[in-house]
Amino acid sequence: MDKDCEMKRTTLDSPLGKLELSGCEQGLHEIKLLGKGTSAADAVEVPAPAAVLGGPEPLMQCTAWLNAYFHQPEAIEEFPVPALHHPVFQQESFTRQVLWKLLKVVKFGEVISYQQLAALAGNPKAARAVGGAMRGNPVPILIPCHRVVCSSGAVGNYSGGLAVKEWLLAHEGHRLGKPGLGGSSGLAGAWLKGAGATSGSPPAGRN
């Protein structure tokens, strides 16, 4: 962590229980799932949107983004993703590359396999390393590690618990079972067909 970071924290209620957001003026550091996990069957139980209070801009942006995710998912693309300042995003690594690809390519309502995501990050044989990157994701939901599933159609593991992953997928319209990986009409599908697993670079201003 940058020694100049003045860390601030805020919490908000969600269908998954309380979420704790932490960050500084330079960017968001973490999203922690504090509450008890829920089941996919409870997807209609959504608390009222959290108030967007004062604080570092990245925390306010993240609160607004999460409110949209849970309450206005059809408008999610209108809300900016906050700058990210966790140490994992401050230096080049395979984990950083995987997380950026996942954020930029796999959109709401899409899923991708561990192997496909490894290919997008430049190493098709690194599916296990992708799993490690998902476990180390400091900002779940925002960087959607819940959208990474097994090629077999199994949901796969999730740091927040299987019930949480199933809820998030159900919230995005997925039926559990064999998925249509990437979605041939979606951005992920376009990358998988046309990009040929090129690695690319993180977007400017996200260092």
UniProtKB/Swiss-Prot annotation:
Gene: MGMT
PROSITE patterns: MGMT
Function: Involved in the cellular defense against the biological effects of O6-methylguanine (O6-MeG) and O4-methylthymine (O4-MeT) in DNA. Repairs the methylated nucleobase in DNA by stoichiometrically transferring the methyl group to a cysteine residue in the enzyme. This is a suicide reaction: the enzyme is irreversibly inactivated.
NCBIfam families xref list: ogt
Subcellular location: Nucleus
Keyword annotations: DNA damage, DNA repair, DNA-binding, Metal-binding, Methyltransferase, Nucleus, Phosphoprotein, Transferase, Zinc
Reaction catalyzed: a 6-O-methyl-2'-deoxyguanosine in DNA + L-cysteinyl-[protein] = S-methyl-L-cysteinyl-[protein] + a 2'-deoxyguanosine in DNA; a 4-O-methyl-thymidine in DNA + L-cysteinyl-[protein] = a thymidine in DNA + S-methyl-L-cysteinyl-[protein]
GO terms for MF: DNA binding; DNA-methyltransferase activity; metal ion binding; methylated-DNA-[protein]-cysteine S-methyltransferase activity; methyltransferase activity
Annotated positions of the Phosphoserine modification: 14, 201
Matching InterPro entries: MethylDNA_cys_MeTrfase_AS, MethylDNA_cys_MeTrfase_DNA-bd, MethylDNA_cys_MeTrfase_DNAb, MethylG_MeTrfase_N, MGMT_N_sf, WH-like_DNA-bd_sf
Pfam families assigned: DNA_binding_1, Methyltransf_1N
Protein name per UniProt: Methylated-DNA--protein-cysteine methyltransferase
Enzyme class: transferase
The family this protein is said to belong to: Belongs to the MGMT family.
Cofactor entry: Zn(2+)
Residues that, per the record, bind DNA: 95, 114-115, 123, 128, 151
Miscellaneous information on this protein: This enzyme catalyzes only one turnover and therefore is not strictly catalytic. According to one definition, an enzyme is a biocatalyst that acts repeatedly and over many reaction cycles.
Record text on cofactor binding: Binds 1 zinc ion.
SUPFAM superfamilies: Methylated DNA-protein cysteine methyltransferase domain (SSF53155), Methylated DNA-protein cysteine methyltransferase, C-terminal domain (SSF46767)
Organism: Homo sapiens
Residues reported in the UniProt entry to bind Zn(2+): 5, 24, 29, 85
EC number from the UniProt entry: 2.1.1.63
